[in-house]
A protein has these predicted regions:
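Conserved PLP-binding catalytic core of the aspartate aminotransferase-like
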Residues: 225-255
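Active-site C-terminal subdomain of aminotransferase-like
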Residues: 135-216, 230, 299-301
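Active-site phosphate-binding strand-loop segment of PLP-dependent enzymes
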Residues: 54, 65-118
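Substrate-binding/gating loop at the entrance of the active-site cleft, primarily
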Residues: 18, 42-57
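Conserved active-site segment immediately N-terminal to the catalytic lysine
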Residues: 111, 125-136
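PLP-dependent enzyme catalytic core of the Aspartate aminotransferase-like
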Residues: 271-301
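Conserved beta-loop-alpha segment that forms the PLP phosphate-binding cup at the N-terminus of a helix
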Residues: 10-35, 47-49
């Protein structure tokens, strides 16, 4: 709460299990009233997963979607029903490489899945009523999920919520409703202490912006590569790009592997390449990839 600037503002921080995927279920259970409705923004695979889980609970309104464009942009022009019990969005989309740069002004409670960019940039986190994030991108190992919840929005759904899925139960038991994943929570604590020592979110944000700027500049400069998503929606966490000529793929793949890079193949549903630049990645690693891209350009001439 300290790092998010939410201390003393009526929020509780929970360390739960089940990954962010379980929150797809817990959010409607706790917030959608019987005969109520919820509004969702569909910006990618994880957003559509959350929508799927919400539908059995009641009317689930998809206010906008970029699915028909293969999620290459973040929809901007949409309205949120004023009678919705909450509005759900996904701040960063790992597979497609898009990121929300602004969030709608609404009187409806706002729920945000920040699994892949939590603690990466400064935001007014008090605009959100629930923030949830799987630990395994920017916070710690897989096994625990951070849920930050504004207490005043709970207890209004009128549902008989199973205890293990009830935020109020987890708050009353201080995240120990059942045996917590102690090692995952402990290592997350160490990561958050590391982040605080780097100047908090504002400190790491500068590093993340520098890393992303370095890679996107090369993607745009190098005639062998092209970016996949709308420029204004590019993610600082996940850069997606492709080769303009697939004839270079075998050479490029051999070059980046030889340079010690791993895991930049794009998701199987998208193809191409995806370079993930989470908080722990140093800018030197990004420079190695940029150098390989420049090398490929030279060898292709």
């Amino acid at each position: 709460l300290e790092l998010l600037g939410l201390e003393g503002k009526g929020y509780q921080a929970l360390f739960l299990q089940g990954g962010a995927s379980l929150e797809f279920l817990m959010v409607p259970y706790n917030l959608m009233k019987v005969d109520g409705k919820a509004a969702y923004l569909d910006t990618g695979t994880w957003a559509s997963g959350a929508i799927k889980e919400a539908k059995p609970f009641g009317e689930t309104v998809v206010v906008a979607s970029s699915k028909e464009s293969n999620y290459t942009f973040i929809p901007k022009d949409y309205s949120i029903p004023t009678d919705a019990n909450y509005f759900h969005c996904t701040s960063n989309n790992t597979i497609f490489g898009t990121q929300m740069k602004s969030f709608p002004e609404t009187n409806v409670p706002v729920v945000c899945d920040m699994s892949s960019d939590i603690f990466s940039r400064t935001l007014d986190f008090s605009k959100f009523d629930i923030i949830y994030a799987g630990a395994q991108k920017n916070m710690g190992p897989a096994g625990t999920t951070l849920v930050v919840v504004k207490e005043e929005i709970l207890g209004k759904s009128g549902r008989n919520i199973p205890g293990i899925l009830n935020y109020e139960q987890h708050i009353s038991k201080e995240s120990m409703y059942n045996t917590p994943p102690v090692f995952a929570v402990y290592t997350s604590l160490l990561t958050l202490q590391w982040l605080k020592n780097k100047g908090g979110i504002a400190g790491i944000e500068k590093e993340n912006e520098a890393k992303a700027a370095l890679l996107y500049a090369e993607i745009d400069r190098n005639p062998l590569f092209k970016g996949v998503v709308a420029t204004e929606d590019r993610s600082t966490m996940n850069a997606t790009f492709t080769l303009n000529n697939e004839a270079h793929q075998e050479t490029f793949d051999a070059m980046w592997k030889a340079a010690g890079i791993s895991g930049i193949n794009g998701h199987r549903s998208v193809g191409g390449y995806r370079a993930s630049m989470y908080n722990a990645l140093p800018i030197e690693s990004v420079q190695v990839l940029v150098d390989v891209m420049k090398e490929l350009e030279k060898s292709a001439q």
